[in-house]
Amino acid sequence: MGFVAICSASEGFIHPGLLHSREDIARMKAGVARGDGAIHDGFEMLVKSPYSKADYRMRGPVEEWGRAPNINTGQAQEDAMGAYQNALMWAITGRKPHAAKAIEILNAWAGRLKKVSGIDGVLASGLQGFKFVNAAELIRHTDAGWTEAEARRCEASFKNAWLPTIEHYAYFANGNWETAALQTKMAIAVFCNDRELFEETVRYAVNGCGNGSIPHMIVYPTGQCQETTRAQHYVQLGIGLLTGAAEVAWQQGVDLYGWNDNLILKGHEYTAKYGIGEDVPYRHYLDRTGKYGFGGRNNYYTKISTASRGNFWPIFERPYQHYAKRRGVAAPYSGRVVEQKRPEGQSRDHIGLGTLTHYRPRIAATKPARVPGVPSGLVARTTEEGIRLTWV
């Protein structure tokens, strides 16, 4: 059982409080103003992206989009990047055209989208929804000129069009589907000031029955992950999205990063170590669905997959900066990947840009900004000894 502090319901949420706090924005601004160093290099990665331009040409909105079958998928993916990256450009530079572009995209999609669909709809909503919500959070809480009525319409869109697809996670699937859902549900909860939804996501993160909860994503204390046997790009997708949820939780005073002896870090270290060419321990594992792993229907998942070994997605900077710089916890293999890939870019699946948004020049151990309050994620179970309460 781990312990995590959270504010009481009456205290509300910190805003902006998803991937970026006011302190984070100030740190980015200062790093860019210096004109050199890692943050500046990360900013150049943002600037050169076509999705960061104030004259980005919106491809949507649409009434429905989804995956498998792909329906207007490119429109949603590209406009999600356009909204988030223009919102980030605005927050850092203060240039109004970027704010106006992000607002244009957010308002257009909020006014038209009715459904996220498809067999892979959980992934669709979880991956792109996270970018849309982060864009909305930045714009709403940085004096960008977005009216409260417009923000409320966006709230309704997140609740009515995006959330239903991810509401029940994906018990039947590999873990990356659920971590996609987890990060976006948590982000929607904060943006909409929905304490009940936030609490539900915290409970699922540590007690959920599917492959995307922390103990079922990182399945052994060694750091071996549920999708280690599938492909290295899939395992990176799963743990990378999990840190999206962990960062949102941290901003709100909940330390999922540290849960169960830094289990999320162990997953990243194991994956990074294997990716850079070193040996890691392996044990057979059957996943929560009974389909993937030793003894399952897809029982060819019986060894570490070499697929995509040595290819790294833009996921390592955020957890490395948290553990090594915020908390002073060693993360040597993640650090080697970060040095190899810096400055971190972005992708359609991953929000990325971690060198810009999370780099810290030195160790400065910190705690969540929120003052500790009541326990979060409370679960009651009946045992032979009586009722047992656990929380995070």
PLM region descriptions:
Residues 7-171, 206, 226, 248-251, ...:
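Extracellular glycan-targeting catalytic surfaces
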Residues 365-392:
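Pro/Thr/Ser/Gly-rich low-complexity, intrinsically disordered linker/stalk tracts
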Residues 124, 177, 231-238, 263:
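Secondary-structure capping and boundary motifs in well-ordered enzyme cores
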Residues 91-94, 189-193:
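Hydrophobic/aromatic side-chain positions at a characteristic register within alpha-helices
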Residues 164-173, 213-231:
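Active-site-adjacent structural elements in folded domains
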Residues 1-5:
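Bacterial N-terminal signal peptides
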Residues 155-181, 188, 194-195, 204-212:
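Extended amphipathic alpha-helical interaction segments
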